[in-house]
């Protein structure tokens, strides 16, 4: 079957989502062609097939004149259907970069410069993990003294001058992020967008020599270009035909992926900048039964930090409990929290634990620590008395708390009393007036213990919950950036394959190229060409025409 369509263009597929529509695709006339053919594979030589196959295909013919084409010296006719025409500069939201001098864009888009910027940012981030962040000046005076500098030169003055004590909001770190973002935008504007613009332009080749110069080239002695177009369309190609010429492509999304990678990296940097300059952070230790206001705890850490309505919310600690391993070590802590508005109405209640925070109005409340607030005891039926527990410093990271119940004249020079020590909320060690061990009691048992004729009952152990509050407007942006980065990185591995064909009498010259999987491309082409039948007898009739 040989159909001459010149100067009209035959398009076998729907408009590609990345292709720019042209005028010749706007108005179409549907023509149904029923073609009954005896088919034979070109590889079969002169042997005829033992069976006949009927092919019925519906194709769309353009009813308007094709766009103006441009012929180059190497036998290539370029069309504007997929990006050649149209107004604008084709650069989208990066058009503002046109006001920059070309020399500045050339410097910013330099690949070694961008790599240097990324390594510098990575080094600063590593330095931020080594240097303690957010400590008091006295801490750095003692840790990095001038009389004994680290590495022979690094003192607290470096930290103070460069702002390394708050690395991720320091001007040097934010400046490097801005410089890297400028390099990414310049590279996208000067390199990636022009490449995509060229890739969107389909082009025809009108000479055998031009097609045979491609990475893959082959000639089918007796084959139809229309059959090749249908086979390519079935394999996912977008197919365009003009007269005896054919152009097909697939995988155009792979050409857009580098731009998507750059945009994703920009999102990550924007999110990180928002986190560093627009967040609030604070921590508080609250005994069970007390409350606090979020705004009293949260402190701004950047010049873009803006408080929200949630800062007026009151947090009430209903109860604090702890879970323990069989060995007695603390395994988990839980805080039953209620959030109340300005009118005292409860708007949210949740029991939080480590790795299970509470979120409200952009504020996240984390369970991070615990403390021992007080012991509630009775003495000879009097009380209860709330005895404040004080932390006792010991070696290592173990916690120990103690309190003292005075006995006798509290105004005497040498006041005696009962000492109580605890390392958690489940057991209390009691010592008598002479400092001798008297026994161990669990607060939940309510069992009395007699010391020097006095009956002591430990009614309750009141713990304090350690909470960390923060607002971070950059988190959703960073998550979106990482998601886009993973997606566009996968898309970038899609091969952008292009195929050209030219009908030269009964012979069909086919060539193609791809930007990835070059070793696999010849096998794919041979697989497709093996499906192209050899036309032995043709009988084409137009059965209907609908305008």
UniProtKB/Swiss-Prot annotation:
Annotated protein name in UniProt: Cytochrome c biogenesis protein CCS1, chloroplastic
Bilayer-crossing regions: 111-131, 170-190, 256-276
Taxonomic lineage from the root: Eukaryota, Viridiplantae, Streptophyta, Embryophyta, Tracheophyta
Role this protein plays: Required during biogenesis of c-type cytochromes (cytochrome c6 and cytochrome f) at the step of heme attachment.
Record GO biological process: cytochrome complex assembly
Protein species of origin: Arabidopsis thaliana
Pfam family, one: ResB
GO cellular component, as recorded: chloroplast thylakoid membrane
Keyword Plastid attached: yes
Stated family: Belongs to the Ccs1/CcsB family.
Keywords: Chloroplast, Cytochrome c-type biogenesis, Membrane, Plastid, Thylakoid, Transit peptide, Transmembrane, Transmembrane helix
Residues covered by region (Disordered): 41-84
Gene of this entry: CCS1
The protein's assembly and partners: May interact with ccsA.
Keyword Chloroplast found: yes
Membrane topology, as annotated: Multi-pass membrane protein
Top-level taxon: Eukaryota
Localization per Swiss-Prot or TrEMBL: Plastid, Chloroplast thylakoid membrane
InterPro entries: Cyt_c_bgen_Ccs1/CcsB/ResB, ResB-like_domain
Compositional bias (Polar residues): 41-63
């Amino acid at each position: 079957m040989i159909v001459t369509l010149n100067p009209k263009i035959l398009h076998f597929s729907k408009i590609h989502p990345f292709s720019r529509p042209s005028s010749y695709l706007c108005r179409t006339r549907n023509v149904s062609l029923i073609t009954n053919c005896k088919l034979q594979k070109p590889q079969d030589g002169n042997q005829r097939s033992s069976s006949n196959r009927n092919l019925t295909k519906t194709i769309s013919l353009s009813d308007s004149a094709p766009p103006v084409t441009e012929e180059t010296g190497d036998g290539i006719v370029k069309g504007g259907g997929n990006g050649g025409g149209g107004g604008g500069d084709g650069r989208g939201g990066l058009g503002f970069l046109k006001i920059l001098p070309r020399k500045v864009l050339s410097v910013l888009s330099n690949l070694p410069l961008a790599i240097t910027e990324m390594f510098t940012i990575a080094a600063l981030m590593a330095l931020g993990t080594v240097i303690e962040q957010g400590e008091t000046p006295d801490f750095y005076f003692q840790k990095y003294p001038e009389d004994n500098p680290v590495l022979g030169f690094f003192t607290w003055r470096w930290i103070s001058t460069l702002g390394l004590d708050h690395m991720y909001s320091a001007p040097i770190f934010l400046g490097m992020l801005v410089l890297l973002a400028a390099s990414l935008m310049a590279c996208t504007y000067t390199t990636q967008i022009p490449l995509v613009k060229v890739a969107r332009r389909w082009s025809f080749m009108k000479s055998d020599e031009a097609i045979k110069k491609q990475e893959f080239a082959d000639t089918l002695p007796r084959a139809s270009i229309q059959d090749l177009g249908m086979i390519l369309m079935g394999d996912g190609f977008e197919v365009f035909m003009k007269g005896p010429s054919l152009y097909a492509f697939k995988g155009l999304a792979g050409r857009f992926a580098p731009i998507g990678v750059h945009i994703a990296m920009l999102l990550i940097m924007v999110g990180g900048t928002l986190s560093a300059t627009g967040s609030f952070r604070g921590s508080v230790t609250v005994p069970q039964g007390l409350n606090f206001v979020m705004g009293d705890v949260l402190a701004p850490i950047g010049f873009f930090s803006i408080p929200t309505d949630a800062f007026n919310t009151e947090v009430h600690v209903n109860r604090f409990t702890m879970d323990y391993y069989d060995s007695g070590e603390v395994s988990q802590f839980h805080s039953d929290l209620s959030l109340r508005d300005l009118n005292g109405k409860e708007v949210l209640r949740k029991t939080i634990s480590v790795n299970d925070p509470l979120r409200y109005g952009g504020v996240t409340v984390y369970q991070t620590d615990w403390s021992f607030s007080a012991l509630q005891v009775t003495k000879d039926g009097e009380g209860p008395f709330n005895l404040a527990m004080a932390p006792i410093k010991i070696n290592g990271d173990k916690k120990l708390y103690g309190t003292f119940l005075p006995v006798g004249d509290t105004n005497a020079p040498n006041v005696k009393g009962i000492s109580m020590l605890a390392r958690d909320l489940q057991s209390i060690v009691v010592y008598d007036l002479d400092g001798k061990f008297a026994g161990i009691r669990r607060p939940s048992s309510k069992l009395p213990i007699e010391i020097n004729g006095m009956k002591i009952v430990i009614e309750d152990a009141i713990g304090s919950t350690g909470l960390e509050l923060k607002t971070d407007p950059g988190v959703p942006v960073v998550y979106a950036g990482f998601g886009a980065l993973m997606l566009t990185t996968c898309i970038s591995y899609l091969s952008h394959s292009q195929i050209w064909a030219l009908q030269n009498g009964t012979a069909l010259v086919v060539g193609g190229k791809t930007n990835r999987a070059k070793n696999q491309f010849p096998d794919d082409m041979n697989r497709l060409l093996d499906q192209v039948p050899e036309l032995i007898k043709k009988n084409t009739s137009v059965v209907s025409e609908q305008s």
